[in-house]
């Protein structure tokens, strides 16, 4: 606890100030500018490599296994965004031809790729690899690549895919047993997959790992694809670093580190979050808008969680609902700073989008922010009053405070293809969005439980679950893990065709769930304490380029 005088208040106010660590990055990203000569050189070299890759994709007379492996390699190398139409047409043909084979490894890869692209291929493709008791044949245990593909395929399962529950257990136990005895780079690939499956990984993180740690070391690598991937990664990294420099200057100008020292200084980690939602160059404007939004809502979150008093937070909540700069005089000085910054930010968004005659869509994000703040206030009231709600009441409020309804809506703002219908669909909290939100909530709650408990927070998801069901901490955490697994099945179902909106928009919701899985891996809070979890990823994506 700490005492502080706020605004014109003469009395001392006791505040539950959290002791957050400072930024790991200082001014490291502040002054980057693209070397246009190098960027131009990379771009020119990419063009013929791109056409050679397209020719590989469109070549005819190839075996099914070779086609699937080529697509998988292109996707893992992070260059598939150039060939979305071609890849979709090839997979559509494979799906409609009911292309089938008796090869274990190829069947598993076919299943995963088709499911990830929205084709509802039947899990019965695996029945031929089972014995008379419906168990996977033990003879498959010697096919490590097949096991790896089966393991990766098991993570795209839906509620109807019971066979894939067995596939996950079977592949996991045999891969864990085989891993120590494998040669490089297969050993590294298996070890990495067991810690972070491909489907739930952040695409850029997985790409960097695959290029540097796996594909470069493979004897059968295609040097055209490898060079293309390296050049493209480095070229995109220049754009990403330029965006981060722009955002870092914006953040430094706001000077929240000085004026709001109680809050987490995590603008670089916020950029990583936005980069996880979309990395492609066409989303540059959307990415910058999203990272600013995440940074701002993080300040608001810490204001409610770690600083504000009941009276102040009620006034702040009311001011946000009214969304009027004239409300600012009702607030203590420190709240005026963030309130003005929020309103200014959304005015900037409206200006940015006015050239495309889309400034009117900003209202969707504003309404979502009002919703989040209202729920933050409920949460802070529970904390201050020492109220522990039933788990159902807790979740109805806590799902909104993940900010994921809000961030999903904001992530659409800068997308040129977003229509009013897309925002309307999103506003109804479709099942796939609800699932992404649930994943965020239960994984966050599990990772932050001990810290929140030590701060005297009793209305945590785990505590509410323990009390409602009369179970231990371990069992409550297992129950939350089961909720996350169920939600992943909902996401996977939501990606299957026909879909109510384009795959482009569904992928953003999928990526939001992926970021949570990565940020809170091993029950660590990688956002609040980025040293162990996010720092290595940030260095790989935004500091170190790939040696060409």
UniProtKB/Swiss-Prot annotation:
Chain sites annotated for binding Mg(2+) 2: 301, 305
Any one Gene Ontology molecular-function term assigned to this protein's record: 5-epi-aristolochene synthase activity
Documented EC number(s): 4.2.3.61
Cofactors that this protein relies on: Mg(2+)
Alphabetic keyword roster: Cytoplasm, Lyase, Magnesium, Metal-binding, Plant defense
Root EC class: lyase
Localization (cell): Cytoplasm
Tissue distribution of the protein: Expressed in roots, but not in shoots.
Principal localisation: cytoplasm
The UniProt record lists the keyword Metal-binding: yes
UniProt cofactor note: Binds 3 Mg(2+) ions per subunit.
Highest rank taxon of the organism: Eukaryota
Reactions that this protein is recorded to catalyse: (2E,6E)-farnesyl diphosphate = (+)-5-epi-aristolochene + diphosphate
One GO process term, biological-process aspect: diterpenoid biosynthetic process
Stated role: Catalyzes the cyclization of trans,trans-farnesyl diphosphate (FPP) to the bicyclic intermediate 5-epi-aristolochene, initial step in the conversion of FPP to the sesquiterpenoid antifungal phytoalexin capsidiol. Produces germacrene A as an enzyme-bound intermediate that is not released by the enzyme, but is further cyclized to produce the bicyclic 5-epi-aristolochene.
Entries under PANTHER family matching the protein: ALPHA-HUMULENE_(-)-(E)-BETA-CARYOPHYLLENE SYNTHASE, OS04G0344100 PROTEIN-RELATED
Family: Belongs to the terpene synthase family.
UniProt-recorded name of the protein: 5-epi-aristolochene synthase 1
Protein's organism: Nicotiana attenuata
Gene from which the chain derives: EAS
